[in-house]
Amino acid sequence: MSEIKDIVVQGLWKNNSALVQLLGLCPLLAVTSTATNALGLGLATTLVLTLTNLTVSALRRWTPAEIRIPIYVMIIASVVSAVQMLINAYAFGLYQSLGIFIPLIVTNCIVVGRAEAFAAKKGPWLSALDGFSIGMGATGAMFVLGSLREILGNGTLFDGADSLLGGWAKVLRVEIFHTDSPFLLAMLPPGAFIGLGLMLAVKYLIDEKMKKRRAETAPSAVPAGETGKV
């Protein structure tokens, strides 16, 4: 149970692929102009990570070490192709919006890195959990950044949610404030860099506060020879 908890905590927070490892920055900065786009690509990446880790782990005993990386890339490309066809079939609006960034998941360092560092050494179910946790950690970071940029840029949240979830999701659109001219800095790549920098700073402050709190609540060490004294 402790290993499962550690995998989840590492993926979601301590070893977050976007906020700690700073991997996959190209889609993170390019696609997060809206919360819907960020959530769509994040969930697609999570599905790819989970299925890839599961497959790599299941085949690890029969994968020659000398050619393991090309085999990993072939597995990732197959999974990404299947996910791309699913999005094309069931969320065509999102498919058009994400464009080239769906097939580019193949080259994402997160996917190859987890296959090599974890799935090639652990069992299938732990590997699937690792892929899911890492993917949800990245999805969370992308969603927060996309939400901030959409609110600051357009004054809305979940605009275009119907392209991801279907026609009923139009009711999810929220207008935070009305604006006739979008705040372009928030919508363009410089705004994404600034937003990511602020998120990194907030995570650092939270980590430091948690570290300080643990140090204050930790029991002080008892000097040797003092335990028997009254």
Curated annotation (Swiss-Prot):
GO biological process per UniProt: electron transport chain
Main location: membrane
Record-linked InterPro entries: NqrDE/RnfAE (IPR003667), RnfE (IPR010968)
Keyword terms of this UniProt record: Cell inner membrane, Cell membrane, Electron transport, Membrane, Translocase, Transmembrane, Transmembrane helix, Transport
Transmembrane segments: 18-38, 39-59, 63-83, 86-106, 125-145, 182-202
PANTHER family from the UniProt entry: ELECTRON TRANSPORT COMPLEX PROTEIN RNFE, ION-TRANSLOCATING OXIDOREDUCTASE COMPLEX SUBUNIT E
Protein's name in the database: Ion-translocating oxidoreductase complex subunit E
Gene, per the UniProt record: rsxE
